[in-house]
């Protein structure tokens, strides 16, 4: 899973680990799983007015279309009860629990702190690039 923070950073920066992960996704070298909730969050965040001037419309639409076309749609797994810092991130935990790799790549690792207790690996973009690219 690429947390929304990584997608946004990758589309804005055009260099660095987040950008490399997004580029790898577009080039079919990184395969992502998603749920309808993740697709919705990507669409909602990328449509925010403050991102209109920094992320090209083609990129905003392209990542949604690419995810729908080549991503793995999974049924969300039940998320164990825990002291989750940001419940808005639970769709990513739910999807990670539903796939073999059980990995979330994020710029906000603290939001996923309890995930390790349930077998989910939380990586920074740099760690994700080293592990998956």
What residue spans do the PLM features occupy?
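Alpha-helix capping/helix-boundary segments
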Residues: 6-7, 38, 110-111
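Active-site phosphate/pyrophosphate-handling residues
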Residues: 5-6, 62, 91
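Residues that scaffold the ATP/ADP-binding catalytic core of kinase and kinase-like folds
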Residues: 10-11, 45, 54, 115, ...
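Residues at secondary-structure transition points
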Residues: 16, 33, 55-58, 83-90
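Acidic, PIN/NYN-like endoribonuclease modules and their adjacent C-terminal/linker elements
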Residues: 90, 97-105, 109-133
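Active-site neighborhoods of divalent-metal-dependent phosphate/nucleic-acid chemistry enzymes
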Residues: 69-109
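PIN-domain endoribonuclease scaffold, especially VapC-family toxins
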Residues: 24-79
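Short, well-structured N-terminal submotif of metal-dependent ribonuclease cores
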Residues: 1-34
